[in-house]
């Protein structure tokens, strides 16, 4: 089933890519209307939107999905339910495609809910307590976005149709459209895990690694960014854009800090995804939708490769994800290490790799844009933190001696997994320049002073040095000492967001509920209610029973008494 799915998806991806080129070069947009029901004067029509953006994004989703399924053939080889896993992944891709090509909020909701439901099934795929908790957190966080989307559908009743794309430009200054835009922004923030909904993204790492490669690169988390790209007119012309810029900037800063304190391999990569999502959202809130789309596509390539390499390492390490137990992997797994380092360098923005073209352009656009000092600081500091945790990860996993058990057989003989990774490796090297020429056919002239041009390079070098220094033992133990304990706990736990969004949200309602139960249900209500009445009746019946047993005279007297009462009632 893996091979059939791979061939079908890769051929569909190629078709979508060629179509997107045709649409882009000829500046074409197609609306396809499909009439579902026609009854007298009423008709229900489903509309699909095909333009270069939707087709290109769809081709990337299909390509990454095909390589992930091909990779899963070996990664999930020993799993008894691999066919169920492949079916869930295909359902995931189908939901994503429905969301991409829909200009209608109702059909978007179908794809949106499909993503939420299937992602829950995939997160709890390994059935244990940790997976169930992570799945519940994921489902409930995304449910807030579903409610926001339903409310926006209700608001759109004012327009008589749910095809939002027809009304965005004309109605952009109206209160109703502003309300719809704010609700859609809330939905996108939950799906793309922006502050204060960030805690579910690292928790979702309980899913199998191929799912992480698909979900955290090109599908679930980017659905929110893609939706806001479609609603960009409202963001860029109202206060919503300023709010989004602040929240997304704080998200990428928080995720970058958290990744420097994390030791779980998959969680570090998940936090790097969160940081890049914040970068996409922030540049989108400034009105540069093509640039956000460009970074979304390049990020999908190297992040999927990074997760695949992490999966191969975990597979060889007997399911151990602690980076402190790794070391010297470049000797034992040279091909996987090469792919891992290329994807890490692309994430840092190494010149002429996929991430460089989008990240460098974003930072230069920020430098010439009218943003305040706080946002400017967040952009550049977050870039430095990205390089820092990437170099820290390379230091822990690739250098030094192997720290795991001596019985671990580390090798690079997983040829099916390696082939899947090689396809993405090529795209991670050439994808950035290829997309740059496609999306921006005429180069931008960005004229900046030399110190502003070199600021990005300087921040990256400082970040790399900091990542190396933070890994050294003396700094590490100082950081974990009681002197720095509170600060490192705060920064390493995503500013306590997982605790606030789980324990913090339910603590007071549960305590109040317990008080109500103790005071009423198990207190005076219990005394004056059923239990007290039951006890009294039991006591009286026992007393009467004893009286009947002990005295024949009383028994006969009561018998006569009840006969008299019955006769009186009978003749009244």
Curated annotation (Swiss-Prot):
The chain crosses the membrane at residues 4-24, 44-64, 86-106, 107-127, 147-167, 170-190, 217-237, 239-259, 268-288, 294-314, 337-357, 372-394, 422-442, 457-477, 490-510, 552-572. GO terms for cellular component: mitochondrial inner membrane; respiratory chain complex I. Keywords: Electron transport, Membrane, Mitochondrion, Mitochondrion inner membrane, NAD, Respiratory chain, Translocase, Transmembrane, Transmembrane helix, Transport, Ubiquinone. It catalyses: a ubiquinone + NADH + 5 H(+)(in) = a ubiquinol + NAD(+) + 4 H(+)(out). InterPro entries: NADH_DH_su5_C (IPR010934), ND/Mrp_TM (IPR001750), NU5C-like (IPR003945), Proton_antipo_N (IPR001516). Its main location: mitochondrion. Disulfide bonds: none annotated. It is found in: Mitochondrion inner membrane. It is a multi-pass membrane protein. GO terms for biological process: electron transport coupled proton transport; mitochondrial electron transport, NADH to ubiquinone. Signal peptide: none annotated. It is an enzyme of class 7 (translocase). Its EC number is 7.1.1.2. GO terms for molecular function: NADH dehydrogenase (ubiquinone) activity. Core subunit of the mitochondrial membrane respiratory chain NADH dehydrogenase (Complex I) that is believed to belong to the minimal assembly required for catalysis. Complex I functions in the transfer of electrons from NADH to the respiratory chain. The immediate electron acceptor for the enzyme is believed to be ubiquinone. Belongs to the complex I subunit 5 family. This is NADH-ubiquinone oxidoreductase chain 5.
